Amino acid sequence: MASLKEIIDELGKQAKEQNKIASRILKIKGIKRIVVQLNAVPQDGKIRYSLTIHSQNNFRKQIGITPQDAEDLKLIAEFLEKYSDFLNEYVKFTPRNNNAIQEEEIDMEQQEEKEEKPREKGKKKSVEEEF
């Protein structure tokens, strides 16, 4: 098994020699449905690195996530935290949003409160509670 440093060096060398994007899927122990892909992109004589996540079944497609993916995402977060100092040296990713997609921030605590209120309204009251 190669170290992350060896993988990054090998990808960088491959991308520079071939002058095209070189990618490698990183198999993180315990992840079931989601894979992490490390990309080396040649750009103006230098190599730019990025990390992306994909469905294990189809690496080229955008991934939709479900609550069942929580454990996989937790393991990815642990991987990112463990190697953060090292990854920060290499991985630079600037999200591009060319599609004019509207973005909204969601406050999870407020959302939970809103979801609880309708449940209380829908609760049937007993005769004692009514009078």
Curated annotation (Swiss-Prot):
Could you tell me the superkingdom of the organism this chain comes from?
Viruses
Extent of Basic and acidic residues compositional bias: 114-131
Q: Where is the composition biased (Acidic residues)?
A: 102-113
Checking InterPro entries in the record gives: PHA01746-like_dom
Q: Name one Pfam family in it.
A: PHA01746
Q: For the region Disordered, what residue ranges are annotated?
A: 99-131
Q: What is this protein called?
A: Uncharacterized protein 131
Which organism was this protein described from?
Answer: Sulfolobus islandicus rod-shaped virus 1 (SIRV-1)
